[in-house]
């Protein structure tokens, strides 16, 4: 609630833009890693589903309540980012072995992290007509693995969840 006075303010050149097709630079990710150190992959645990179900209906996916039910049944923690602080989001994302989400603005929080993410699975919610999913260029360099699902019938997400939950039990 009060202004912050700094003796020195460091500003890095803008390194990420909407619709970029080049991956985020290693230099920029190094700066972010210094600011928010990543937990080792071996310490990351659990599955997180970032939900849009409590947003206005125009921003949601029809049937997302079912996805939440399914992911919760598989042991996933359901997160509604608009209900928690940025710091809580960063801690949850840095600690998760796997993050599953519908594409949307919630993944901009990832841009505050360097290479702190485990496995990321993004489910398409709007058509890209075969174009490069714009989030890939800044998510992929930050995570252990990145999968962008454009077909809900692929079954990969279900198989992945079974593998993760079996390893955690």
Give residue ranges: language-model regions.
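The feature primarily captures lumenal catalytic ectodomains
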Residues: 1-169
């Amino acid at each position: 609630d009060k202004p912050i006075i700094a003796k020195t303010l460091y500003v890095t050149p803008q390194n990420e833009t909407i619709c970029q097709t080049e991956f985020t630079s290693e230099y920029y990710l190094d700066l972010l890693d210094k600011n928010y150190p990543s937990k080792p992959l071996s310490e990351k645990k659990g599955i997180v589903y970032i939900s849009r179900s409590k947003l206005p209906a125009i921003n949601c996916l029809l049937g997302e309540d079912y996805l939440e039910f399914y992911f919760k049944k598989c042991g996933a923690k359901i997160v509604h980012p608009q209900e928690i602080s940025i710091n809580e989001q960063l801690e949850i994302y840095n600690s998760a072995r796997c993050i599953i989400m519908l594409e949307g603005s919630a993944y901009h929080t990832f841009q505050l992290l360097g290479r702190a993410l485990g496995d990321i699975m993004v489910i398409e919610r709007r058509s890209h007509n075969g174009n490069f999913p714009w989030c890939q260029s800044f998510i992929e360099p930050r995570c252990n693995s990145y999968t962008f699902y454009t077909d809900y019938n692929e079954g990969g997400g279900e198989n992945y969840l079974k593998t993760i939950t079996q390893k955690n039990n």
